[in-house]
């Protein structure tokens, strides 16, 4: 996939606000502060397209970005830690699960995991959820450049055991761009269906 055109499209807080067109959606999911927005900015080459923050839980809406005028990249709120109350976390959880279960135009879920803390309980729960609803998913290990060689080997083994049904596992560094072309190449088979 070559990205030549990128634009913010819409933010929604309820399923009723989702776009009605039938463009394929590549969905980016992961824990709060795992680097979803940073990854989107890196992939598109547009700094600031997706708002980033050091504070977990800044993304509170489902954000749609129109790519090449015929594909959506969808930035979901993070799961896990966020500086919000239990009631708001429950609303987010219901919104995200309903979206993933009901949205027919989802072509692929890209699950981002912090390579320094792979397969935490919340990540394993998300993997199980995606598999139980037959959603194709791939794994992106973020912050991969911060690992030692030994940690890289250990992380690879952990991921092979807990995400055996993942369509791909890509080691990604937004800093160096490592993994970008590999990840974009994987997207082609999910948007050309």
Curated annotation (Swiss-Prot):
Residues 22-193 form the EngB-type G domain. GTP binds at residues 30-37, 57-61, 75-78, 142-145, 172-174. One of its GO terms (biological process) is division septum assembly. The keyword Oxidoreductase does not apply. Pfam families: MMR_HSR1 (PF01926). InterPro entries: G_ENGB_dom (IPR030393), GTP-bd (IPR006073), GTP-bd_ribosome_bio_YsxC (IPR019987), P-loop_NTPase (IPR027417). Mg(2+) binds at residues 37, 59. Keywords: Cell cycle, Cell division, GTP-binding, Magnesium, Metal-binding, Nucleotide-binding, Septation. One of its GO terms (cellular component) is cytosol. SUPFAM superfamilies: P-loop containing nucleoside triphosphate hydrolases (SSF52540). The keyword Metal-binding applies. One of its GO terms (molecular function) is GTP binding. CDD domains: YihA_EngB. Its cofactor is Mg(2+). It comes from the Bacteria. Necessary for normal cell division and for the maintenance of normal septation. Belongs to the TRAFAC class TrmE-Era-EngA-EngB-Septin-like GTPase superfamily. EngB GTPase family. NCBIfam families: GTPase_YsxC (TIGR03598). This is Probable GTP-binding protein EngB. The gene is engB.
């Amino acid at each position: 996939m070559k990205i030549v055109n990128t634009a913010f499209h819409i933010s929604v807080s309820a399923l009723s606000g989702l776009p009605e067109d039938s463009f394929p959606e590549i969905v980016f999911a992961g824990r709060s502060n795992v680097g979803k927005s940073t990854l989107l900015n890196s992939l598109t080459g547009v700094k600031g397209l997706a708002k980033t923050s050091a504070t977990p839980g800044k993304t509170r809406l489902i954000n749609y970005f129109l790519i090449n005028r015929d594909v959506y990249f969808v930035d979901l709120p993070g799961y896990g830690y966020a500086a919000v109350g239990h009631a708001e976390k429950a609303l987010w959880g219901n919104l995200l699960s309903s979206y993933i279960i009901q949205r027919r135009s989802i072509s692929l879920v890209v699950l981002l995991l912090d390579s320094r803390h792979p397969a935490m309980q919340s990540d394993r729960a998300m993997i199980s959820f995606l598999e139980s609803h037959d959603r194709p998913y791939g794994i992106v290990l973020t912050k991969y450049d911060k690992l030692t060689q030994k940690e890289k080997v250990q992380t690879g083994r952990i991921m092979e055991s807990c995400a055996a049904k993942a369509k791909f596992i890509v080691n990604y560094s937004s800093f160096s761009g490592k993994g970008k072309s590999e990840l974009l190449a994987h997207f082609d088979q999910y948007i050309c269906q």
